[in-house]
Amino acid sequence: MERFKKASSIIETLKQQGHEAYFVGGSVRDLIIDRPIGDIDIATSALPEEVMAIFPRHVPVGLEHGTVIVVENGEPYEVTTFRTESEYEDFRRPSSVQFVRSLEEDLKRRDFTMNAIAMTEEGEMVDLFAGQEAIQKREIVTVGNAADRFQEDALRMMRGIRFVSTLGFSLETKTKQAIETYGHLLEHIAIERITVEFEKLLTGTYCVKGLKELVETKLFSHLPYLQMSEERLLKATQYNWDSFETDIEAWAFFLYCIGEEHPSVFLRQWKFSNKKIKDIVAVLLTIRKRKEKDWDTVLLYKTGIHIAEMAERVYEAMIESYDHTSVERVQTLFQALPIKSRQEMDVTGNDLLNWASKKPGPWVAEMIQKIEEAIVQGNVVNEKECIREWLQECNLL
């Protein structure tokens, strides 16, 4: 409750000005579940302009949706006016937002009952839709009619399965049936929004359970490049996903599980950044080499420790080995390398030009590469004079 206490002065100030105000959303849910608290959000009957007038330190980030960031005790908090939403367009966004003075009207527009619980600054729960009961049963239940909620915003179906993965809850029967019925509406949603939810699914503590629900509800069949992947997705549920430390590893392992032959094409379709695509593909390529042989100095040097650590964790999951010392072994091998990058070489292209009676050309880069490999393999000490002597002995100068 300590973090809520820091924000309670905002609620107290709003109430002193004659407004209602409550803590709402995921932070309240996580408090009840006893999970780490993320962002703390506040809902109020005060209109955005009233909030800004009351709190001088504010940032008007989403006034059309009624949201103002209020800075209190050095921390930013989203303060959003109670609102209701009109008919939705394209199964993804409301055509308009109306500000209201009723907490109930605000809570009834939310996706799941566990996310529709409000809390006073004293810690008293305002639970109008049996959200605490759903949490006790470890069930994900929509607020009101599931068909209505999913037709309003089809991404809620993906969010529901993401919560299965992150919380370990189960989909309530009617909620699950509605996902099976309305899953096709997900095709109206921007892939960027789906990717965010899918990544949270893959990195969730109960990822295997989430993937099973993805298959059972047939929602996977409405996702890019996964339409024909039922058997492969089920294969993915047979592995242990607990050892991954990054989203890069989770995506690399997922692509391995579904047998994706063109990972770059898949990832571009899912709108990943070029940097992320590069890292995921690098992990997959490294695993391919790792399957052929154990780590040696050259492979480890060329791979780099960042990719090597991730590749080793994914490789261990692939072969269903739970030897937690394997990554430590990679780290030890890397630390023992004579150099960690080309920048650490005690020789430059200018040195080579001074030593050799040749004009500049491609031979300089080729020679640097030979020296680099020789240092990494331990054939020459990384000292300028030693390198010069080695070049002369090898008739390379």
Swiss-Prot record:
GO terms for biological process: RNA repair; tRNA 3'-terminal CCA addition. Its cofactor is Mg(2+). One of its GO terms (molecular function) is ATP binding. It is an enzyme of class 2 (transferase). It catalyses: a tRNA precursor + 2 CTP + ATP = a tRNA with a 3' CCA end + 3 diphosphate; a tRNA with a 3' CCA end + 2 CTP + ATP = a tRNA with a 3' CCACCA end + 3 diphosphate. Pfam families: PolyA_pol, PolyA_pol_RNAbd, tRNA_NucTran2_2. Disulfide bonds: none annotated. Keywords: ATP-binding, Magnesium, Metal-binding, Nucleotide-binding, Nucleotidyltransferase, RNA repair, RNA-binding, Transferase, tRNA processing. CTP binds at residues 26, 29, 110, 153, 156, 159, 162. Its EC number is 2.7.7.72. ATP binds at residues 26, 29, 110, 153, 156, 159, 162. Mg(2+) binds at residues 39, 41. Catalyzes the addition and repair of the essential 3'-terminal CCA sequence in tRNAs without using a nucleic acid template. Adds these three nucleotides in the order of C, C, and A to the tRNA nucleotide-73, using CTP and ATP as substrates and producing inorganic pyrophosphate. tRNA 3'-terminal CCA addition is required both for tRNA processing and repair. Also involved in tRNA surveillance by mediating tandem CCA addition to generate a CCACCA at the 3' terminus of unstable tRNAs. While stable tRNAs receive only 3'-terminal CCA, unstable tRNAs are marked with CCACCA and rapidly degraded. Homodimer. A single active site specifically recognizes both ATP and CTP and is responsible for their addition. Belongs to the tRNA nucleotidyltransferase/poly(A) polymerase family. Bacterial CCA-adding enzyme type 3 subfamily. This is CCA-adding enzyme.
